[in-house]
Amino acid sequence: MTNETPFSKNAEMYRDEKVFAEGEDLGLMIKTAECRAEHRVLDIGAGAGHTALAFSPYVQECIGVDATKEMVEVASSFAQEKGVENVRFQQGTAESLPFPDDSFDIITCRYAAHHFSDVRKAVREVARVLKQDGRFLLVDHYAPEDPVLDEFVNHLNRLRDPSHVRESSLSEWQAMFSANQLAYQDIQKWNLPIQYDSWIKRGGTPADREKQIITHLNHASDEARDTFCITLNQNGQPISFCLKAILIQGIKR
């Protein structure tokens, strides 16, 4: 992740947030990965450690990397609390992974790629450290192909969190995978429900930015309201919306 501030300030909130802690996509990732006892797993943008900890019973070792020292500390203490011994966390960036070529059987990245300063470089790094026939499992929210809706959702997320760089479209992901010999496959798409109040609190969004967000949501087109499931109360205060999420698999060829 690039801008460390929101995660540094609110690391504990990310550990307890249901979107990260209890998402059904975790089980889907594990099922898709076809884990074996001898596998080594790398989780990029590990956050509070939920993904690495979820994989840990099925593999030999999980390593989680995150750009923020505070997140690494939270994830490490979380693993210690759970008594998990085959997981470790360290500071590092997706664009410069501190590992040799062909190091991992499985690489995961869950709700983090939209923070990467150079997502294309990050995908190149994934392909470098992934073993031949290894699996890259990516979960993130994505932008619609319609450029107006793309700009709407990326602007919304940047208003709330300056560390948001860009949620890519699926055609962009396909191109990045193809350029790095990763065989692309859509595994599953879903709407990711967002409760407005907890989303704002978790992001540590200043009051002036929140006013801009409320205006942005109130001025949404009918198509944007439908696409992102925007719900407002009678006073125009946001209640909830959704982001478009996907699990993508890339097998290194």
Swiss-Prot record:
Keyword entries, A-Z: Methyltransferase, S-adenosyl-L-methionine, Transferase
Residues holding S-adenosyl-L-methionine: 45, 66-67, 94-95, 110
Domain of life: Bacteria
GO molecular function terms attached to this record: methyltransferase activity; S-adenosylmethionine-dependent methyltransferase activity
InterPro entries linked to this entry: Diverse_substrate_MTase, Methyltransf_11, SAM-dependent_MTases_sf
Coiled coil: none
Known EC number: 2.1.1.-
One example of a Gene Ontology biological process annotation: methylation
Any single Pfam family the record assigns to this protein: Methyltransf_11
Family, per entry: Belongs to the methyltransferase superfamily.
PANTHER family membership: METHYLTRANSF_11 DOMAIN-CONTAINING PROTEIN (PTHR44942), METHYLTRANSFERASE TYPE 11 DOMAIN-CONTAINING PROTEIN (PTHR44942:SF4)
Name of the protein this chain belongs to: Uncharacterized methyltransferase YcgJ
